[in-house]
Regions:
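Aromatic- and acidic-residue-enriched segments that line the glycan-binding/catalytic groove
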Residues: 62-75, 134-137, 172, 176, ...
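Active-site gating/metal-coordination segments in enzymes
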Residues: 116-258
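A general structural motif
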Residues: 249-252, 291-296, 314-318
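Hydrophobic faces of well-ordered beta-strands that scaffold small-molecule active sites
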Residues: 51-55, 118-120, 159-162, 188-190, ...
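Catalytic metal-binding/acid-base residues of hydrolase active sites
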Residues: 56, 225-226, 275, 341
Length: 380
């Protein structure tokens, strides 16, 4: 696939400018108020590139290496699940195994869905934060090496986000540098907690990780694996339906109230599932910050001042909800996502975006791929 520059004044094929421009007239109020990227990477036929920011690959070798340790006992999505949910999940993993691990099947599905490039990342449970740090590093390297191999084999269809052992910050920082500088990965996937410890837990010292991520200018994709205190969410798949967005909400709130976003401005953190509940229930945080001193112990500005710096995928399953997300945070902060290949994913991401009311075509193009291309440096 060849890309052609669309920056005004540049007719040079293969020369891609991902510049920010002043907000144009029309479009959502939030987008007009803050400005957004005006250029969009296009293919040879002039169609705007479509990039999926939220999709998973299961590394079977890594899973086999740790199978004797019974990883599921550490996974909230399994630990807090009814017997029926476990049976349904086992069947899903069996039925969707080719989609999870066979690239040719994946590419056929991408073509069917109208996706040009996936920013493929590990299956969310394959962070393995519960392992001993040395083993965690070994497995992370296996996963990252395979992702790099996929990108090298199909460079026109994939970029990759790796994984690092956050249970040991020194190893995590070193592996992050290797991912970016040696393997060419565009970022990493993390969970909203480290085996139950918050990302702001002083014992983890993850400010070093966030500082390195900012220095390298890479994407952090923060994906949950169920809620860690899911005793009340075992039936009806609630530890996914409610637990996944809840864990994202809790993890993001700690990053905001704990000052991570204030100490590391410019972090590029993408939140799946449209940001959990924060994308639509943000006003309560701001009220608490104004009303209570214990909400102002670290941050100096209202929580939404920091929330607006995050990026959100489009997985809302409803055009009006997606419209509200865009209105609040701006089209520049929203990226097409599918959660491929899981059953809770969006099967028609392009159709969902096209059905959003009152959304100008230029903003649709940015959401479908322009924003992701800018963040992931596709076309550079």
């Amino acid at each position: 696939m060849m890309f052609t520059c669309v920056t005004p004044g540049c007719n040079q094929p293969g020369h891609h400018h991902l510049a920010m421009a002043a907000a144009r007239k029309g479009g959502s109020k939030a987008a007009r108020s803050k400005g957004h990227a005006k250029t969009v990477v296009r293919d040879r036929k002039g169609r705007a590139l479509r990039v999926d920011i939220h999709c998973h690959y299961l590394n079977r070798d890594a899973a086999a290496k740790l199978a004797h340790l019974n990883p599921s006992q550490y996974e909230p999505s399994v630990k807090f699940a009814s017997q029926l949910t476990r049976e349904v999940n086992v069947k899903q993993m069996h039925d969707r195994a080719p989609k999870l691990s066979t690239i040719e099947v994946r590419i056929a599905d991408m073509d069917r869905m109208g996706i040009d490039i996936q920013a493929v990342c590990p299956a969310p449970q394959q962070t393995y934060y519960w392992t001993e740090p040395g083993l965690g590093l070994e497995v992370s390297r296996m996963i990252n090496d395979r992702l790099a191999q996929i990108v090298a084999t199909w460079p026109d269809r994939f970029v990759a986000l790796g994984t690092v052992p956050l249970q040991n910050v020194e190893l995590a920082v070193a592996e992050l540098e290797r991912c970016v500088k040696q393997l060419g990965l565009r970022g990493v996937e993390i969970n909203p907690n480290v085996a139950g410890r918050e990302l702001t837990d002083p014992s983890l010292n993850l400010d070093r990780f966030f500082a390195k991520a900012r220095e390298l200018d890479i994407v952090i994709f923060m994906h949950p694996i169920g809620f860690t205190q899911g005793d009340r969410l075992m039936d009806h798949y609630l530890n996914n339906l409610i637990g996944n967005p809840l864990d994202t909400t809790v993890g993001t709130s700690h990053l905001i109230f704990g000052g991570v976003m204030e100490r590391h401005p410019g972090l590029k953190i993408v939140l799946p599932h449209a940001g959990g509940f924060l994308g639509h229930y943000w006003a309560r945080m701001d009220h608490g910050w104004r009303a209570r001193p214990d909400c102002r112990t670290v941050i100096k500005k209202p929580p939404t001042s920091y929330l607006k710096k995050f990026f959100f995928d489009t997985i809302t399953f409803d055009p009006e909800m997606l419209r509200n997300l865009i209105d609040k945070f701006g089209a520049a902060q929203v990226l097409l996502g599918t959660d491929y290949p899981f059953d809770m994913g969006e099967e028609d991401p392009v159709g969902l975006i096209n059905s959003v009311p009152r959304l100008p075509s230029a903003e649709k193009e940015r959401i479908m791929g322009g924003n992701a291309a800018r963040l992931l440096k596709i076309g550079r």
